[in-house]
Amino acid sequence: MTRLSLRYVVPLSACLLLALIPVVMHSYIQVEIDDCKSPWAFLPESAQAFDSGGNRDAWMRQFFHSSQWQEGSFFKDGLRFDFSIIRSYDAKLLYHRPETSLVEHAVVERRGIEWVQTASGVLPVHRAFYGNTDPAILASYFLVYHSSPVASPYLAQLQAAPVELFSGRRPMTLFFVQAQGAPGSLGEIEKGERVWLISTWEKHRSACLTER
């Protein structure tokens, strides 16, 4: 049996204690940091939230591990737009094709990202296209992580991992909007969704900056 020299005891003990910090924080204490106010407090005035009841709350917890969410609708140019704002500490449940769960009875044909210019910079808007369907369908969303919109949530999580390892997890927030309309109305739908997303982001950003 090899004896450990006393001069190594202190640094080795320090390393072991350091390694225990994230284990305790994430396995036992489960430290979670909310870096902004509830996002649905900053919706555009034209958007009306509604209470979906306990069944929807259970559904949100099951599919997104979320206890902070809001859904509602608004009308623009004769079209109805439905939105979902969901915050979760299990980020992958939000960024991995959320339209699969939120858009009913439709199959995505392709996905893309539009880089939308706003007053505060570029906003990466993710889109799900459903082809030449009747009715026409389009879903758009953006994701906020560490108070910033992210184009690649995978990369954002990797970059944040060293910090969250010792400070605790931070939530990701999904701002999602969808609409259906007559064939040929995709242009109007896209415009309406873009306007809502920009407005929602600017209000959310302003409220979060006020907290700091």
What is each PLM-predicted segment?
Residues 6-26, 113-212:
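A short, solvent-exposed beta-edge/loop patch
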Residues 40-41, 50, 70, 175-178, ...:
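Solvent-exposed, non-transmembrane amphipathic alpha-helical segments
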Residues 27-47:
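Alpha-helical transmembrane signal-anchor/signal-peptide segments
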Residues 1-4:
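Membrane-interfacial, low-structure loops and terminal tails that flank and connect transmembrane helices
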Residues 22-34, 68, 73-78:
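Terminal, regulation- and interaction-focused segments at domain boundaries
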Residues 46, 51-165:
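Short, solvent-exposed recognition patches
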